[in-house]
Amino acid sequence: MNKLSITATFICTVLLGSAVALPSHAGELRVTWKEPTSFTDVRPSNESRARFRERTLEALEAHLVELAASLPKSHTLSMVVTNIDLAGQVWPSQFIGFGNNMGTDVRVIQRVDIPRMTFSYSLTDSSGKVLKSEDDFQLKDMGFMDTNIR
């Protein structure tokens, strides 16, 4: 997996208002989802928002654990995710020519609707020394439709 693909996978990282400590086989990953209900776009198309957040979070946690496995054993990556904007926009199906007035929605994804994520992070070693950190890091994947992440 190339660096762009790994970076793009972080864009999916969303939802839940509490800190989650995810131990891995190598380093440690700590993620805090700061006010996920105020994220720009974590809107479901055809399910409740709460269930969508729960389902999305479960998938993202599993993927983050995979990524954390590449950290050196003595390192800890701490992230505070402050915003998520998923690719595309959710529209009522009748607005785009699908379905009828049954209340279903559809997420329409076009090349210009790129996924974005804003977060702060800190990578520390076993002594607590900060190896790398950044505040309000803005990640976006303009080529998300051209790559196969999984």
Tell where the protein language model's regions lie, with residue ranges.
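Bacterial N-terminal signal peptides that target proteins for export
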Residues: M1-I11
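Surface-exposed short loop/turn segments
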Residues: V81-S126
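Outer-membrane beta-barrel proteins
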Residues: V42, G88-W91, F144-N148
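A short, structured loop/turn motif at beta-sheet edges
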Residues: A69-L77, S122-S133
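Bacterial N-terminal signal peptides
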Residues: T9-A19
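Short secondary-structure boundary motifs at beta->alpha junctions and helix caps
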Residues: N46, K132-R150
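Sec/Tat signal peptide C-region and signal peptidase I cleavage site
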Residues: V20-A26
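N-terminal segment of the mature soluble domain
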Residues: W33-L86
